A protein has these predicted regions:
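Exported/periplasmic ABC-transporter solute-binding proteins
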Residues: 14-40, 44-49, 53, 57-63, ...
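Bacterial N-terminal signal peptides
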Residues: 1-8
Length: 242
């Protein structure tokens, strides 16, 4: 369900469970939700996806959510500081990695991030570090190898990781940085050149929100995500155990 639609929704009924999550979890969480619903007849899972910081801000502003799942620790730290999640329920549930991708039909002869400094490379996309976890991971990784500043003039900031993926898939940019799980969605449109060594591991935290009428099914969903069955579903979409 679109985030804007969630903002206009009345308080969820007892059998509705609202999950707000990072854009990179879209495909995997749809599958997780479907399985959870099949095991809990009558429960309807409503899903909202976007850049982690954007989704969090919507929760802070009053959007209904029973669970928040983000793509980095900084977003969840902000959620804890804003007192919109229960810190005792916070758990890391998945691991990912940042990869450099190019359009599948690219003829630039690129092999690694160092090649992005070549004159023939004009546009490189990644999430806006101010609000998008993959952008923050990318920034940290590129700073580590002294490539962040040289690439600033070529930057095309994306609002979330899926937008960055689309830019590359549509040949609108020469290269981009996305999560490995996102690149795997379009193997015929993009080609992975390199995995980036990030200073911090790419871990995904999840937590229960503290809203007054939180769904009674929220705890069960969180446990399902952490269970062997939930982890197996995530693994099918490329996520690894934390």
């Amino acid at each position: 369900m679109a985030l804007s639609a969630l903002l206009c929704m009345p308080a969820a009924s007892a059998d509705e469970l609202v999950i707000s999550a990072a854009a990179s979890l879209t495909n995997a969480f749809k599958a997780v939700a479907q399985k959870f619903e099949s095991q809990n007849p009558g429960v309807h899972v409503l899903l909202s996806f976007g850049a982690s910081d954007v989704v969090l801000q919507q929760i802070i502003n009053g959007a209904p959510a029973d669970i928040f799942a983000s793509a980095d620790q900084k977003s969840m730290d902000k959620a804890v500081a804003a007192k919109v999640v229960d810190p005792a329920s916070r758990r890391d549930f998945a691991r990912n990695e940042v990869v450099l991708i190019v359009p599948a039909d690219s003829t630039l002869g690129l092999h690694s991030a160092k090649d992005l400094t070549k004159a023939g490379v004009k546009r490189v996309t990644y999430g806006n570090p101010a609000s998008v976890p993959v952008g923050r991971y990318t920034q940290a990784a590129l700073k580590r190898v002294e490539l962040w500043e040289p690439l600033q003039g070529k930057a095309v900031l994306a609002q979330n990781v899926r937008q960055a993926l689309d830019y590359v898939a549509r040949d609108e940019v020469d290269a981009g940085f996305v999560f490995a799980t996102d690149a795997a969605i379009m193997p015929d449109k993009v080609k992975v050149l390199q995995s980036l060594a990030t200073p911090e591991p790419v871990l995904y935290p999840i937590a229960l929100t503290v809203r007054e009428h939180r769904s009674s099914h929220a705890q069960a969903f969180l446990k399902f995500v952490l269970s062997s069955e939930g982890q197996a579903i995530l693994a099918r979409y490329g996520f690894r155990k934390p």
